[in-house]
Amino acid sequence: TFVCLNSNTKFSYPSVFATNNRKVKLDGEAYFEVSANKNKPFYVHTSKGEIKVLGTHFNLEAYSNADVFKTSLFEGKVRVRVKGNNIYLKPDQMVCYHKNGKIHLETIHDYDQFRWREGLICIKSAKLKDIMKTFTKYFGDSIVIQNKEVEHYKYTGKFRQSRGAINALRLLQKDAPFTIEQDEDKQIIYIKYRFKYIKHNYIFFKTKI
């Protein structure tokens, strides 16, 4: 069995599995390739639900502090159990469980969202405020938007995780009116208004784009 963990993920497993099952715990996101063993099924326990696997390839996003719990199947078969509901997935299907209790089953069309295993953060028509939540997950820095005008700007693009948060923000900055201020000690990045100023006279002019 192969497991690949995403950023800020906690994964625990026993040093020796039980004789009749394989149980692990996950808080975060991981990609699994589970070897088949009908006599010893594989279980993933999370704060929002449980996955039962016989032999398959799937992605599980189950951060305890997130609003959505997602299971995406690429090969094989899994059973997702949430709030007493059993959902059986087929390859190329995803099930989303929302904190309001809604369960949504859909066909996977966009596989870029799973390219985090390659070190890529792929964004598709996402609002800036939601992108900042994603960046916080991947980069670790807390990002505070002080320029509320840009919260609903939408972006599509790919960012290399290894290049860091500031590099990713500078790419977004080309198309939106904000500046970046970083507090390295507190690991906080502030997104502020864009402005121009005359240094010696201390006259500030805020401009909108």
Task: Enumerate the language-model features and the residues they cover.
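A residue-level detector for the "anchor" residue at the start of short, highly conserved motifs
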Residues: T1-K199, I203-F205
